[in-house]
UniProtKB/Swiss-Prot annotation:
EC number(s) given by UniProt: 6.1.1.19
Extent of the signal sequence: none
Gene name in the database record: argS
Family: Belongs to the class-I aminoacyl-tRNA synthetase family.
Catalytic activity: tRNA(Arg) + L-arginine + ATP = L-arginyl-tRNA(Arg) + AMP + diphosphate
CC per GO annotation: cytoplasm
Protein name as catalogued: Arginine--tRNA ligase
Organism in which the protein naturally occurs: Shewanella frigidimarina (strain NCIMB 400)
Database matches in Pfam families: Arg_tRNA_synt_N, DALR_1, tRNA-synt_1d
Amino acid sequence: MKSHIESLLEQTIESFKQQGIVPADFQARIQVDRTKDKSHGDLATNLAMMLTKVAKKNPRELAQLIIDTLPASSYVAKVEIAGPGFINFFIDDNALANQLQQALTSDHLGVALPTKQTIVVDYSSPNLAKEMHVGHLRSTIIGDSVVRALEYLGHNVIRQNHVGDWGTQFGMLLALMEELRAANGEQAKMELSDLESFYRAAKVRFDESTEFATRARQLVVALQSGDEYCNKLWREFNDISLSHCHDVYKRLGVSLTRADVHGESAYNADLAQVVKDLDAQGLLSESNGAKVVFQEAFRNKEGEPLPVIIQKADGGYLYATSDLAAMRYRSNVLKADRAMYFVDLRQALHFQQVFSLAKLAKFVRPEMSLEHTGFGTMNGEDGRPFKTRSGGVVKLVDLLDEADVRALELVRSKNPDMDEATLTEIARVVGISSVKYADLSKNRTSDYIFSFEQMLSFEGNTAPYLLYAYTRVAGIFKRATDIDLSQAKIVLEHEKEKDLGTKLAQFGEVLTRMTDKGLPHVLCGYLYELASEFSSFYEACPVLAAETEAQKQSRLLLAQLTAKTLKTGLSLLGIETLERM
């Protein structure tokens, strides 16, 4: 409906141009919003006030002129002027009912698909050689939910897991392995737990020994230069680490696969060319032996230019170098129209600099959109970054294990007579869903407090509440197995039917808002509101005990569309639904 009203207003602006009311080259930014008070209609626009200056007319006069010029539409019951010049649209109940009826049989619940784009989404991207920790959670699940929604809207989405499989951490591992082999000539078979402790030991040596640190950096350069021995060990380290990552992805219900891994090492052969191309354009400068780029727009508090370091004095490359190579690949090879980077907000300056440099150096096509969709931190209940009691980093698998245990206790307390296998499966879904939803339901740009007690609550905007809401709606059809809805029609008579129908019709708008800015919390908020709206409808409007057969069938169709929308919305968040809880 919102897009339909926007289209009517766009046609009105074109008519104004032809009449000379606004200049022929005028570009209007049409904004249509949902009203908070239904007495003011369903949708409203401030277009008249926006046009006042250019049309040289007062807002209320312009508002009336807009109404008089609007093309006729069966979707609009009436249009009114409010206040200084707001235009309020009242949607026709029959038109809304028809839209909902069509949504029931549509492949995409009636959602209008946008122009198809090729969109690269860079997310998760953990540094390898160590286990995933809670700091990897946000990028992984926020990115995955946006990917799912983009694909649902028909876009060609290319997942890119830009893992940190190159760099100093591998130099440390190689240097320690070199020392151990020199000492005893043996190579222990590495399991993941060994790799984790191996990394910690290497880090201690790196921090304590200047000689070891120097050797580690030399081995990084050797690795980047294609040394066969270094590459063999590097592949072993990576294989162990990636196996762990994909075990975590599977447990989280994340759609990333091995085929999506395109880490820093994938661009190793291009790094020297990046340096050459920047040099050929006269963009490189030298600073303390390193090759850097200064851009006028980026300065520190003292007004001194901030460098983008492209190549270190020892010949090694940095994140900026591989990021530039990746951007060029994504633009020129993958032909991306848009690239979204789900990376911590603390990297904002880095991305501002490399995005600017990629455009300046013409590494990406001018029309390609580069977007840093950053996020805040997950904090403990003390408001500080989430840590173990001893102050260490919390492994992601440990967090998920605890979620399983707590969810099992919760589910068992509510279903004491349920068999253990069913309890365990329900608890698995509730536990993982609660961790994911608690994160996704927060604005990604904000920090948030991680609390098991809050996320496992059956009250408020939580996964258990929504999972239960879905089972409640789906449960209606377990009691209505003999009802034929093939000829049923949706009729909106009761106020609560209209409210539920209006909310159901907003699904497409919500997905557009979510994918435009990479904001899963918008979808979470909508699903919570939809579940709450259905609860109000269900209390006020008997479904199976409706007064007439036609009314019962209409309300069953509304329940059916609600169930489909909840299930689809939760699946786009990467959350499984349950048929019983």
